[in-house]
Amino acid sequence: TLFVCLSHSSEPCRGRDIGLIARASHVCGAEAIAPERRQLAAAAPYGEWLIAGRILLSDLPDREHVVHTHASVTRRQQVFGYTEEELRLILAPMASTGIEPLGSMGTDTPLAALSDKPRLLFDYFSQLFAQVTNPPLDAIREELVTSLYNTIGPECNLLDPGPASCRRLVLPFPVLDDDALSKIVKINREGDLPGYQTYVARGLYEVDGGAAALTARLEELCAEISAAIADGARIIVLSDRHSNAELAPIPSLLFTAAVHHHLVREKSRTQVGLIVEAGDVREVHHVALLIGYGAAAVNPYLAIESVEDLARHQVYTSVAPEKAVGNVIKALGKGVLKVMSKMGVSTVASYTGAQIFEALGLSREV
């Protein structure tokens, strides 16, 4: 057991580094630990590994931008239960200002568990906040210590660092637009990034089968993703695109959490990164939940295509389509930072998989 006493130190130490030298059994200042620092820094060419290994999203080749028709956007809005109120009061203000809209005077909407209307799975969860022991951050005035930067890909053994430990795709923001996701889906198509492969899992199930079909499909998807990892996939995209009258989308939160915990049980979670391509995401709370339950990044494709369509037709917003999309992504990302800061979490990397939420009205099985 090592006992440390600081009360007899005569040196001022406020704002200075301190070090714990285990073999000397005492705490010392920055000058005393300088040799150990230099020794650790020179143990390996860490800087060279980082520069050579990091993969920047901006360096990936651009892909074709797809513009969806108004009829296509409207049809999918109906599939995912979009309302006129959400378009007018939530998405349009974000598209115009780049800031999450604020309301006042509370809400008379009943809890999702007590409502007689269909509700999204997101609505059954509420965010936790810091109480006493874990002080929150001020996401505005203390922005310097926060980061929305993340990396994705296989994680190597922390106790055996090497060049492979730095072979990661850098994501500057946790919310991706369609073009950025297209880059990731088609990564290594030209064979320029060996060892990186993306697998897209389609989260759709047969409508006629009901709950039993949903459960069976989730089990199939988990097995499918495990097989993809064994075949070399290092990025998994969980997508609910291409739904139709026969195939309904699985709620993205249920899909993400099921895959995340399956991979944890299989001890293969650190071999891949998860990205969610979801049509049911249109609020900050939705993005925060998906990240909290395992996603490294989220592509709210229908929200993006909706504001792009609104801007093209100058409905509820007067900004250009490209500006509207950028503003929505900015608003959602900054909103996630606000949610994280309420629990004292400063980086999105620490928030990924943290599950700092509570559920009301869901069975233990769900």
What is the meaning of each model-derived region?
Residues 239, 300-303:
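Short beta->alpha connector loops at strand-helix junctions that form conserved
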Residues 262, 302, 324:
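Short, acidic/small-residue loops that bind anionic groups at enzyme active sites
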